[in-house]
Amino acid sequence: MGRVIRLLAGYYFVQTESALLRCRARGKLRLAEETPVVGDLVEVSALNESEGVVGRILPRRNLLERPLVANVSQVVVVAAMTSPEPNLILVDRVLVAAEVLGLKGVVFFNKTDLHQREELRGIYEKAGYRVILGSLTCAPAPSELLDVLRGQTSVLAGQSGVGKSSLVRLLCPELDLAVGEVSAKTRQGRHTTRHVELHYLAECEAFVADTPGFSRLDLPEGLTTYNLAEYFPEMHGAREHCRFGGDCRHRGEPGCAVQEKLLPSKAMAPERYKSYLALLEEVRQQERSRYK
């Protein structure tokens, strides 16, 4: 048995306990149109010391669609303090996706050597998320981050230029990844990761998936204007205290517990509520388009 860590030119690179094998899929898999993805646990038969054949894909614990990776246990959202400015709606979009999929969410704020912003830590710790402040300009990797990754299969997510590839390089110094600089003109990362790949971190017995930089992540299926609040942990249970109960969408209704209790008490950060409203509007537009 092994884990698919990379797809390249029609080959599946499978990490077993003793070797890294370059594999093709067995014919019955191709006929069944079953395609292994990065993160899959597979049954593999070695042909020699470096090549093998994938015979079966074991049942998946979960499957992320974007990035396409299977059997993930947590999502680490990497965001920069500056250059580029933190896109908190993107951070919250990823965290909502993690909540829907039942994955643990962690937020890592990179480039804290450029500008310390403790208020960002407070926003997400208040929501119950683990927040790590660090700098990727010098080794070794923050011990707090290694503790979070230990024994997990983690996906690194975040927009281009925030330092995901730099983080993987810091965790795995032997790797030769292209590190993206942020273009002064476009504020986008350059020369960044173009594919999903799992990297094994021997120091903490973990797998980390570096993902292509993106500026937008599609919301998972099943989200509605009624259940979106369930995926904001600080809003759990608020609806039962709203005047309109399950019909309250927390966007201006009279007697809304979120607006009359959570926000005034600072139990929910205004930035998170702003993200909620933005995502709520997006979900509403999706619902309207489905019923046209």
State the predicted function of each range:
Residues L20-G27:
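A short macromolecule-binding patch
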Residues M1-L8:
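Structural detector for short beta-strands of small beta-barrel domains
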Residues K111-V162:
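Canonical P-loop GTPase G-domain recognition
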Residues R3, V53-I57, A178:
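Residues located in well-ordered beta-strands
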Residues K164-G180:
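A conserved segment at the C-terminal end of the G1
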Residues G10-V14:
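Short aromatic-glycine-enriched beta-strand elements
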